[in-house]
């Protein structure tokens, strides 16, 4: 145990000494370089390395383009997070349809907002179906609605 501590102390002392030597040698090198450089050489170097800064050129379209975010914003603040007809929806609170629109799913959490669901489409509530009849999670024909020929 004592030998481990002694070795650790020896390593720390060696590391500290080597850092001090490196700092001293770096400082002397910098001082020697400072003495060798004259003021005119320094000014010439600064002029050569400095670029002339010109006015930044903006693209011509920046004034006429409307940001994409502005185009997708809903009309009222109440509809901030809902989608309009034809847009992507997922039947979650994050991607839901506005108003009376319903989400017609095409895959797992992947759908489109429509007015109502057609026959044999996945449904949860009868109000989602155009026929107003949802049975076993599918929109069905409504047998109570009959077309009367004239």
From Swiss-Prot:
InterPro entries: UPF0506. This is UPF0506 protein SJCHGC03047. Disulfide bonds join 116-130, 123-134, 129-139. Pfam families: UPF0506. It is found in: Secreted. GO terms for cellular component: extracellular region. Residues 1-18 form the signal peptide. The presence of a 'disulfide through disulfide knot' structurally defines this protein as a knottin. The lineage of its organism: Eukaryota, Metazoa, Spiralia, Lophotrochozoa, Platyhelminthes. Glycans are attached at residues 20, 48, 110. Its main location: secreted.
